[in-house]
Amino acid sequence: AEHHLAAAVSEAGGLGLIGASAAPAEWVRNEIREAKKLTDKPFGVNIMLMSPYADEVAKVVAEEGVKVVTTGAGNPEKYMELWKNAGIRVIPVVASVALARRMERAGADAVVAEGCESGGHIGETTTMALVPQVADAVKIPVIAAGGIADGRGMAAAFMLGAEAVQMGTRFVASKEAVVHENYKQLVIKAKDIDTRVTGRTTGHP
């Protein structure tokens, strides 16, 4: 999300996240500062570690006083000391029990157990299968993600051992999301069989 949506989620009682994606560090810095103008509540930044700007973005979040960093597409261990010294809570996205355990050993404050229902490149394990196994394997809090769209999904995640949920696609059609109206309408009108999974042939579904 960009700063409008991240701030709106935080204002509504959640923890909004700015998606750094593959954006340059100064773009991320500007997004953080713009979000601070819209909310005085905590928000976080998601850093895609395969980004060519990851090293610079890692420094920016520390400099700007971001409260939470979530990470994906890479190993955040080399940034842990920097972020911990800045008082940042680090929450990596994981798609397996083995990675969850490794992140716990590395000092993660929590993990996002993200199943294949999520709208991103992740493993083949479903959310319902992954979350309880991760919850049993680590002592840090587990956040469930992938296919959760309402209170029923959240309640199910809690029963599986999660302590929170992460949602992304659920907010695509919100007025704060910087997405073309045609795309929003396609999401709203989509039925249960309309999802298409890409990337299987490259090993990144």
Residue positions per predicted region:
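Active-site entrance/lid segments in N-terminal catalytic domains of soluble metabolic enzymes
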Residues: 1-141
